[in-house]
Amino acid sequence: MPNPLTPQYPGIAVVELFTSEGCSSCPSADATLARVAERAERAGRNIFPVELHVDYWDYLGWRDPFDDARYSERQATYRALSGSTYTPQAVVNGVSDCVGSNEARLSSLIEAELAKPATTQLQLSARFSAAGVQAHYQIDASEPAQTLALIVVEARRESAVLRGENAGERLAHRNVARAFATRPLASGHGAGDWELALPAGFVRDGARVLAFAERAHGGITGAALVGIAPG
């Protein structure tokens, strides 16, 4: 039962899809995430889907242009949820997971998390800078010992796959993580600035910044998503 003295905010659902262009099972999950994103945006719900492309399938012959070893490392922290590491894996608020193409199960997990009050309130703004993206955050949390994560997200990308399991396919992506960083929060209250570099070829149109706070032992407690203003 929630502590009545703990500040509570509207529920949120951060959906991390661990995916790869080198995995033949992943395109259907990418399409599922795109539908989740579109429905959430139309309804104005606190659902924050993001694709994180892992690098461990590159050996199959196709190097995913959006992959990053940090996303593979992050997925490894979720191994306890299912007992294995696989793609496509969808993780909701860091506490539950399912096969990313299982839309009914994913929707059920999302609704379960939205029904829970968030315990961290995040306010966020972002603008393009000479070095990449500069973000300003303000946090009000009931739990002080947390980590703040920041992800710069491209709205839409497409890729023509030439080799590997998806050779010959043209894959479409929504909400693709392109820059990622974390920092510890000593206090549950405060504000700060953050600058992240962007990769070559970054598409600015529709890009956004996602921030979320998470407990050291797992579980996302609050999140915010904003567009990026011109520099």
Feature map (PLM): residue ranges:
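Short active-site neighborhood of thiol/selenol oxidoreductases, capturing the structured segment around
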Residues: 9-24, 50
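Typically the conserved alpha-helix immediately C-terminal to a functionally engaged Cys/Sec
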Residues: 25-41
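Short, conserved sequence motifs used for protein processing/export or organelle targeting and
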Residues: 63-87, 91-231
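Thiol-based oxidoreductase modules, predominantly thioredoxin-like and allied folds used
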Residues: 43-72
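Extracytoplasmic
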Residues: 10-12, 44, 87, 145
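N-terminal cysteine/histidine-rich coordination modules
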Residues: 2-6, 29
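Solvent-exposed loop/turn segments at secondary-structure junctions
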Residues: 20-24, 32, 54-59, 96-99
